[in-house]
A protein has these predicted regions:
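Short coil-to-beta-strand transition motifs
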Residues: 159, 188-194
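Glycine-rich beta-alpha junction loops
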Residues: 141-144, 188, 199
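Short acidic, glycine-rich loop/turn motifs
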Residues: 183-190, 223-225
Length: 259
């Protein structure tokens, strides 16, 4: 597309700064990028604004879409704000809210927010250009501000001792990437699995937590207050399969367990 690209490994590199200054930009827009040094975001006449995939000050951090679903939120949105010295704390320009559907996975929500965000960036640029922007300061701290830290292997593991809704939300909040995972013991063999599509059923039962109950077409796992029905799973060393396909060539022992 004949775009002029600067891709520095060090954002404070003097050569990069010089080339950026030569562009003489009067406004900079940032989407899904690392923290900028002050010399960069202060450079344009009208500053630098960022698009963030949450309703700030909620879910500051690297994974706002994931954590909104993991925490069971029923709404989220996008925010444009002017960048300042800290991460995701600058003055808010515009916000747009949308619902989170009960069975929505993070990949689906990401795509809806992507289009919403593009429209909000366009609106923000137009209002800055026309001198029509009125900003709002963010609340900087407080017990109600939830964060969205980077996702690591440790916080993607399913805790089968959690309640039904928490497990369900964690799995869909990590689907398709990076994926919620669990240890599984079957026929005396321990392995790792990633679980993707699931459904839930809230019901009292007497099964032990984590026990796997297969049938001809589905796989369910007992949790404290119901069952998680696994619709899509990837066993380590195998490809991702829907439950019915897995059950065609894979058998579970009577004491098979997720843990």
């Amino acid at each position: 597309n004949n775009l002029y690209l600067l891709q520095p490994s060090n954002l404070k590199d003097e050569g990069f700064i010089s080339k950026l200054k030569l562009l003489n930009a009067n406004l900079q827009v940032v989407v899904a990028f690392r923290m900028l040094p002050k010399i960069v975001w202060k450079m344009p006449q009208y500053g630098t604004f960022n698009l963030h995939a949450s309703l700030l000050p909620l879910y500051r951090g690297a994974a706002p879409i994931h954590w909104a679903i993991i925490n069971g939120e029923n709404k989220t949105g996008v925010t444009t704000f002017f960048i300042d010295e800290k991460i995701d704390t600058g003055k808010i320009i515009f916000q747009k809210e949308i619902p989170i559907y009960d069975d929505e996975i993070v990949g689906e929500l990401h795509d809806r927010l992507m289009y919403l965000g593009a429209d909000l960036v366009s609106k923000t640029v137009t209002h800055i250009q026309n001198g029509e922007v009125k900003t709002q300061k963010q609340i900087q701290d407080g017990k109600n501000i939830k964060m969205a830290p980077k996702l690591f292997t440790e916080n993607c593991k399913i805790n089968w001792g959690d309640n039904l809704d928490s497990i369900y939300n964690r799995i869909r909040g990590l689907n398709p990437s990076p994926g919620a995972w669990s240890k599984m013991k079957n026929n005396g063999v321990e392995t790792t699995v990633k679980i993707y599509r699931v459904k839930k059923e809230k019901i009292k039962h007497s099964n032990s937590i984590g026990c796997i109950i297969p049938s001809k077409k589905n796989i369910k796992v007992a949790v404290e207050d119901g069952y998680i029905f696994i619709e899509e799973i990837k066993i380590s060393g195998k490809k991702k399969l829907d439950a019915a396909s897995l059950l065609n060539g894979f058998s579970f022992s009577s004491d098979a367990t997720m843990y």
